[in-house]
Structure formats: structure tokens, C-alpha cells
Amino acid sequence: MGSVGMTTSVTISFAERYATSGQFDAVFREGMMLVDATAGYLEGAGRRDSKALRPAGALIYATESMRLTTRLLELASWLVIRRGLKSGEISSDEAQKKRRRLKLTAIGRPEHVKGFGELPARLRELIEASFALHDRIVLLDRALEQPETVIAAIATNPVGDQVARLSAAFDSAQ
């Protein structure tokens, strides 16, 4: 009865749990679908769209499509590393070595580039989707690099200490 006000702490790594969960699988699928959609667009309709642009627009298209594919390559690499770790194909040490080669840094958005709004709508959609995925992966990656969080498994009962003292007082009186 004297332990009513006590708490027990356990270490929980939310990022590790997330990276091995079904939610990670959904992000993985989303990332791979974005890679496929981008490749399909750039190799198909994107070629036609780029030919319809003025020279300045074609230069912006070429620049932004290269940035898009580079960003997606980095994101896909990160996802494949995490999936390999999750499935046991690679060790934690191997995953860390491979991860260090990636450059998942915060990067500027191209909306400020003069003429960005003139790019084909589909390319802009793919760029925006890649940044949304990038932001999610960077947050998860940072969380994975942080020390684990200690969380109280049982919340402290504000009255628990008083109940424990009363119980101890009555137990000692008898």
C-alpha cells in the first residue's frame, strides 16, 4: 500500500518504434510511389511539357527536375536503409555507415525562383510532394539520432503521497 504514490520509469524510443511499424511501411510505399510517379512524368509527359516552355522556363525546368530527382534519390536511399534494418538485411552499424553518406539537410524551397510558377503544374505538384516527404523523413531521422526519451509508465497520482502517508501512519499505529 505504501507504493501508491511511486512511479516507474521506462525508456521508450518513439522513433525506433515508428521506424519498425506499419506507419513506416506506409511512408516507404508513399516514397517509392513518388519516385515511380516522378520517373514516369519526367520520362513521358514531362518531356513534352518542357519542350513547350520558353528557354528561360526550360532552364528552370531542367534545374528543378534535377533537384527533384536528387532529393528523391536521397529519400529513397534513406527509406531502403531503414527497411533493410527493419527486415534484418543489414546491421545497425551498417545502417549508420550508409546513413552518414546521405545528405538529408534542410533545403530551400524553389517557390522564390523567378518563373517557378510557370513550370508545368504536375512538376510543381511532384516537387511539393517531395518536400513534404523530405520534411517527414528529416524529422524522423533527427528523432532516431536523439537519445531515447524516458517516460513515466505510471503517472504520479497527486494524492498518492498523502494516501501513502496516511496508510503508513495507520499501519504504524496498530
Annotate the PLM regions.
Residues 2-174:
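Surface-exposed peri-terminal alpha-helical interaction modules
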